[in-house]
Amino acid sequence: MMVIAICGPTLMLMSAAMSAAADDVDLSPVIERHEMVPMRDGVKISVWTYTPPGDGPWPVVFEQRYADLRGAGTRKAAAELAGHGFVVALVNYRGTWDSEGTWVGYRTIGWGELQDGHDVCEWLATQPWSTGKVGTLGSSQGGYAQNFLAVTQPPHLVCQYMTDTGLSLFHEGYRIGGTTRPERFKSLATNCRNPADNLALLQEWDQHPDYDEYWRQEDCSLHFDKMNVPCFTIGSWYDFMNQGSIDSFVGRQHRGGANSRGQQQLIIGPWLHGRLNKGNHVGELVYPENAAWPEVPHMVRWFNHFLKEEDNGVDREPAVRYYVMGAVGEAGAPGNEWRTADDWPPAAEMTPMYFGAESTLRAAAPTAETSVSTYTSDPHRPMSIPGTAFPGATDARAFEAQSEVRTFTTDPLTTPVEWTGRIRAELFVSSTARDTDFIVRVSDVYPDGRSILIVDYPWRARYREGFDHEALLEPGEVTKIAFDVGWLSQVFNTGHRIRVTVASTGAPLYEPNPQTGGPQTIDALADGVVATNTIHHDRQHASRILAPLPVH
């Protein structure tokens, strides 16, 4: 393993379109054009192209998204990339903004009867200004779109570059950990030509609460063997979709097609979802300058190599680069450095840390015959986690002080402790309700008392046996719920403490569980019931987390 230094400016190329008017933006000498491109069923999709000056032809890079493409920031970023010798194309999904048709989510960009991404890719490849070599880029839903596109195997698709991506809308989007997220997706109506299309889509999702064939039709992880192009993937430690970014890299690297296996690269840094452009500013922390990543210069090198056959060495760089986070603002603190690896994850020994009486978190298993932590969960008065996305490195004490929340904390550390890998929770719980949620959070507690959040994840109790079927709780009966909390690479410094937090609500980030055990619909919360939930941490029911301690 080698420690490396990475620094430089960052720019999230297509992350958040500014609201400036479409006119009065000087893009010269790049030429901007608008096309309505027919799909295989005759519906026309809106495509904006940005062409470099000169005679061409040029390779093409394109992004699919549902957001407005006319913001000044988006157009300037597209023109900037075009200035490096590419035709840049921005594409709106079917039924959004200027694109015709009905918005049905990702159903028309995948491997079904309609394959809009595939059709756009091939149209771009056959234009007179195109060399026939096409690459893609995009963040978040633009990453989903790239995975969907790769499965359809367009003949002219050569490479991809994705940030904070996902593979399965069920697992990483609408039903994270089995919990529902309608409020987050209701807002997509603002992008639709017909806003009613989005409500109809959410109602359709309600008819499929479990992971069934409907959702498998939008799960790219089932089709890695069809993905057959090199891809550079950017993941973020403080991203609720980081699981998707990592799974995408691992799946393509080991189970992809012949041109995919061994040609993937991954970088994971201390960033928020879609906020790589903020550099080293994450939540309430300011990491050292080395936490920044020069995304656009690196992206240009990636596309220059694969689309222009430039031997610039980008294909020979480490398969994995990851940032080991450490204490911020403490001189000489370990961590806050980049490392490389040949694969993911690095070797680790899963080490148990047990919950105990008096809110302790210890390596020793409990010996008490009876030991519990009990709280009341009211879906109509949920605990508060502000926002609709993971808040990142923020002080969690306000959340931890709320009545429903239970914390388990180590003694101050006498030596630094590193966790690199995926944390797993194993909870023994009981409830007076037929269904409830458990949100597990991990924080780094600084000597001044700040509890800086690192990672969290929810789990709906009815899915403790798997997402393909429901298993409601028997009130009062102790049951085990085990799930992965998430990935991290963190050095907890001497004098710090490690804290695990458990709660059953955290809105609006996570939609409250009605706790009735009934159907999971948009309006189910109206019938919600109060539950008494208990975490057991005795000799026979040893609730714990498994921490990934590196094996050097």
Regions found by a protein language model. Give the residues of each.
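Primarily recognizes the serine-hydrolase "nucleophile elbow" in alpha/beta-hydrolase
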Residues: 63, 115, 122-191, 206-207, ...
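Alpha/beta-hydrolase-fold catalytic nucleophile elbow
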Residues: 137, 161-164, 234, 267-270, ...
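Bacterial N-terminal signal peptides
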Residues: 1-16
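Serine-hydrolase catalytic core
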Residues: 207-266, 419, 491
